Amino acid sequence: MFHKILLPIDLDHPESWEKALPIARGVSAPGAELHILGIVHDLGAAMIASFLPDGAEQKAMEKLKAGLVDFANANLADVATSEVHVAHGHVPEAILRTADTLGADVIVIASHPPDDLTTRLVGSNADKVVRHATRPVLVVR
């Protein structure tokens, strides 16, 4: 049983949490903290950033935070301690950085079977998190 669980999710993709959330609950010790993480991709280095209005990334982070709060209210009302977090940047790095900052005992992350050539060659976000994590990672398919 774990006391501080980090669950990275993508609100636009229910498969990122539909199976992982019950698993995160299942490995939680009584009174555990469940931390939900959403990530806004870094657009600063991308060519598209020059076409976006000023403050677009900040607005995206605020919108994501509001969505995560709604998600937590709908799905975690019975959890004693839950918090939502928004990170910014490359997904695997943001997950690992947040886990370090929180001192998470475990990362519970959804993965999907590789379904395209890029995923097979480069690897999924879950694969990168597993490779570089300094704490247990529970991958849910």
Write out the residue ranges for each language-model feature.
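Intrinsically disordered or low-complexity boundary/linker segments at protein termini
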Residues: 1-19, 79, 131-141
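Glycine-rich, Arg-bearing micro-motifs that act as flexible, cationic patches
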Residues: 109-128
